[in-house]
Design a protein with these regions (language model features):
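Core AdoMet radical
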Residues: 109-119, 130-166, 178-194, 206-226, ...
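Short, acidic, metal-binding catalytic loop of nucleotide-sugar glycosyltransferases
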Residues: 204-207, 274
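Metal-dependent nucleotidyl/phosphoryl-transfer cores and adjacent nucleic-acid-binding surfaces
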Residues: 70-77, 81, 107-108, 184, ...
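Alpha-helix termination/capping residues and helix-transition junctions
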Residues: 73, 174-177, 209, 235, ...
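Short amphipathic alpha-helix with an adjacent loop that forms part of the alpha/beta core around
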Residues: 168-176, 230-231
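N-terminal pre-core extensions flanking Radical SAM catalytic domains
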Residues: 1-158, 176-177, 349-389
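Conserved C-terminal portion of the radical SAM core fold
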Residues: 16, 216, 236-242, 262-388
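Distinct, well-ordered alpha-helical segments
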Residues: 195-201, 226-233, 296-298
Length: 389
């Protein structure tokens, strides 16, 4: 087996600064490595000056060798699960993209998934303080969730966010991005990132084959960029705007709390005008199917069909207590939609031990701290959870 990410990919999407081959890699085994040899440890952004040469470090070489022998490394369990169930994993999608376009340039950084910082105006229920400053500001909620082992980043501070932000800019400034083929910029919310415009200018200067380069911005849809930013974005011929939208109207406001649905709906319609004018190559959703919304997917697909935005769906396996795979398959199958991608996710035989008591506790705590009531916006899902404890 081969994975482009282990040879030329980097994902930097949490405030600990872990340098993973892709965002799906579960690098706990690297983080727990106690060997003194620095080449054996998971590198972080705070340990380096540049991304150049990163894939020659021991953890990456070991991943490359394991895959070449036909074995999925421990950190690649999510792709292993998806491929076993017949889904097109991140590994397969990226390999196909690079093979179709003959995009490989050995020894270079070609695939990036980064958060320039974690400034965010939302507190999504499946997120955590390591990826959202809004979450990081909710100290009491984080303490309560930690009592139930529900938060992976327990004590984020403004100082840590700022340290990451400046170190990220320093490392990117020292990195050769001339052969970049794909970048996904997320957050936080990218349009709030302090260095977003600076980074767009760097990409515009350095990428030597812009026609072979895809720029993807992952946004929660709450921000429509100012003209100077928009003009710079529209210079890239392969611009993709991806909306992290898992529901509509009141359920959307509950799951991804912080901004009213009317604002998000209006912004997406503005982006659609640029798509219709040929200025944006794709508008697409990344909708996470979780135990919070699995029964409401038909209304979501209808909405996006009506406004003319492509849909993409992602199964959630972590955190376990928000996964649909805690529910029996026959329960999930009652909510099939006729959409193959959604239905394949609903019917997948993925084994996750039920923790529905924790699911209810998580819902209760988030309700309390966001002044929302999940039961009022998805009573059916809450009842299903209770019936299957």
């Amino acid at each position: 087996m081969f994975c482009t990410h282990t040879h030329s990919g980097v994902a930097l999407v949490d405030t600990n600064g872990n340098l993973r081959p892709c965002c799906r890699a579960r690098t706990v085994s690297w983080q727990n490595n106690t060997q003194e040899d620095e080449w054996s440890k998971l590198p972080t952004i705070f340990d380096i000056e540049t991304l150049d040469g990163l894939h020659k470090k021991k953890p990456y070489i070991e991943l490359q060798n394991e895959l070449a022998s036909g074995v999925f490394p421990e950190v690649c369990v999510e792709c292993k699960i998806e491929e076993k169930e017949g889904f097109r994993s991140r590994r397969i999608e990226t390999n196909d993209l690079f093979s179709r376009g003959d995009l490989h340039v050995k020894g270079t950084i070609q695939d990036l998934e980064i958060a320039l910082d974690f400034t965010c105006n939302m507190m999504c229920r499946m997120c955590n303080p390591g990826q959202s400053s809004k979450w990081g500001s909710k100290k009491e909620l984080v303490k309560e969730l930690n009592l139930y082992n529900m938060v992976s980043d327990a004590d984020m501070t403004n100082t840590k966010y700022r340290t990451y932000q400046e170190q990220m800019k320093h490392v990117l400034d020292n990195t050769d991005l001339s052969h970049l083929r794909f970048i996904k910029i997320e957050g936080g919310e990218p349009f709030y990132s302090k260095h977003f415009e600076w980074f767009l200018d760097k990409l515009d200067r350095e990428v030597i084959e812009p026609d072979k380069f895809e720029l993807m911005i992952v946004t929660n849809g709450s921000v429509y960029p100012k003209k100077t930013i928009l003009d710079k974005l529209l210079k890239f011929p392969n611009l993709v705007i991806t909306f992290s939208i898992d529901a509509i109207e009141e359920l959307a406001e509950c799951i991804r709390w912080g901004v009213d649905w009317k604002t998000i709906d209006g912004n997406m319609r503005q982006y659609k005008k640029h798509k219709d004018a040929g200025e944006i190559r794709h508008l697409v959703t990344n909708s996470v199917i979780s135990i919070l919304n699995f029964n409401r997917m038909t209304e979501l697909t209808t909405y996006f069909s009506d406004i003319g935005i492509e849909t993409g769906y992602h199964l959630l396996t972590t955190p376990d207590y928000l996964s649909i795979y805690q529910l029996p398959k026959d329960v999930r199958m009652k909510h099939l939609t006729g959409n193959k991608k959604i239905d394949d996710i609903l019917m997948a035989d993925i084994d996750i031990a039920p923790e529905l008591d924790r699911t209810l506790k998580h819902i209760e705590l988030l309700d309390t701290h966001t002044d929302t009531k999940f039961e009022e916006v998805n009573k059916e899902a809450l009842q299903i959870i209770k019936e299957n404890i």
